């Protein structure tokens, strides 16, 4: 698998969960002899919602909610076969979305 790159994008609502998962991936890749670039923090997406509290009157009474989506990027350069096997066996938290692309 020479001259290849594995790009891993992680998304999560909890920043502690995503940091722990990136640390696990980086340690696993380095332990198997691959070169790692990252984790690179990508911009956090903030979604804000405003909801009326009262169903009839009191238009001024509103609640505001926010969801933050944290993202990280990890590049693994020149992965070995051991690296791919170890990453496949790696068990990550349930709240982390993982996208893997080969390039």
From Swiss-Prot:
<dbReference type="GO" id="GO:0005840">
    <property type="term" value="C:ribosome"/>
</dbReference>
<keyword id="KW-0687">Ribonucleoprotein</keyword>
<comment type="function">
    <text>Involved in the binding of tRNA to the ribosomes.</text>
</comment>
<dbReference type="GO" id="GO:0006412">
    <property type="term" value="P:translation"/>
</dbReference>
<dbReference type="GO" id="GO:1990904">
    <property type="term" value="C:ribonucleoprotein complex"/>
</dbReference>
<dbReference type="InterPro" id="IPR027486">
    <property type="entry name" value="Ribosomal_uS10_dom"/>
</dbReference>
<dbReference type="InterPro" id="IPR001848">
    <property type="entry name" value="Ribosomal_uS10"/>
</dbReference>
<comment type="similarity">
    <text>Belongs to the universal ribosomal protein uS10 family.</text>
</comment>
<dbReference type="InterPro" id="IPR018268">
    <property type="entry name" value="Ribosomal_uS10_CS"/>
</dbReference>
<keyword id="KW-0689">Ribosomal protein</keyword>
<dbReference type="GO" id="GO:0003735">
    <property type="term" value="F:structural constituent of ribosome"/>
</dbReference>
<dbReference type="GO" id="GO:0000049">
    <property type="term" value="F:tRNA binding"/>
</dbReference>
<dbReference type="Pfam" id="PF00338">
    <property type="entry name" value="Ribosomal_S10"/>
</dbReference>
<comment type="subunit">
    <text>Part of the 30S ribosomal subunit.</text>
</comment>
<protein>
    <recommendedName>
        <fullName>Small ribosomal subunit protein uS10</fullName>
    </recommendedName>
</protein>
<dbReference type="InterPro" id="IPR036838">
    <property type="entry name" value="Ribosomal_uS10_dom_sf"/>
</dbReference>
């Amino acid at each position: 698998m020479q001259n290849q790159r594995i790009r891993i994008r992680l998304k999560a609502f909890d920043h502690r969960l995503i940091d722990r998962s990136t640390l696990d991936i980086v340690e696993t890749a380095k332990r198997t002899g691959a070169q790692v670039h990252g984790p690179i923090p990508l911009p956090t997406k903030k979604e804000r919602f405003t909801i009326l509290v009262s169903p009839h009157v009191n238009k001024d009474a509103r609640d505001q909610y926010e969801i933050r989506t944290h993202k990280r990027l990890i590049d693994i350069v020149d992965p070995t076969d051991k690296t791919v096997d170890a990453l496949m066996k790696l068990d990550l938290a349930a709240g982390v979305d993982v996208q893997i692309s080969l390039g």
